[in-house]
Design a protein with these regions (language model features):
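Short beta-alpha connecting loops at secondary-structure transitions
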Residues: 13-20, 39
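C-terminal, non-catalytic "cap/extension" segments appended to globular domains
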Residues: 1-8, 24, 28, 32, ...
Length: 171
């Protein structure tokens, strides 16, 4: 991205990256919150499909606010996501992974080559340890909100770069 000369290509690449991040973090958050709300409400009694539709629209409304008009068929969006039944409560892991990678990338930008050996060790370890143990060599506390904020800060920087390029190109 840094070395590309065509600013319109840079704009397209930045848009794609930002959209991917939004889809992974915010969209998966909607799915997670919908599942939590549905199970919480189910604990109070049976739920009708209309009640599930309302929960779906409510959680999606939190993401989109007034920026997107959700047409009538969208209320059934929850019904085609099979993992709500077969593999419950795993969407949070997409959010966790995306923000972890963004925050680790920010660390790499700050530390440079000194970061690489620890990162390679992290990759080699795979799922052999708990997440908190995997990131301990980086001095990361997964319970510290400021660590997670660094991922969002990186997205903000990408967005600001996109704004500058778009303004310069008149798009």
């Amino acid at each position: 991205l840094e070395n590309h000369r065509d600013s319109r290509v840079k704009i397209a690449l930045l848009c794609a990256r930002i959209e991917d991040i939004i889809a992974t973090t915010f969209r998966q958050n909607v799915l997670t919150r919908f599942e939590q709300a549905a199970h919480r409400r189910r604990g109070e009694g049976l739920l009708s499909s209309d009640e599930l539709c309302e929960l779906w629209l409510e959680e999606n409304g939190r993401l989109f606010g007034g920026s997107v008009e959700m047409i009538e068929p969208y209320r059934w969006g929850w019904s085609y996501i099979g993992h709500f039944i077969h593999s419950r409560f795993y969407c949070y892991s997409y959010i966790f992974g995306e923000l972890l990678v963004l925050a680790l990338y920010q660390r790499y930008l700050e530390e440079g080559d000194a970061f690489v050996p620890r990162y390679l060790d992290l990759l080699k370890a795979g799922g052999s340890k708990a997440p908190r143990d995997l990131v301990a060599p980086f001095g990361i506390d997964l319970h510290n909100r400021s660590f997670w904020q660094t991922g969002y800060d990186l997205v903000k920087e990408l967005y600001q770069e996109l704004e500058l390029l778009a303004e310069a190109e008149g798009v």
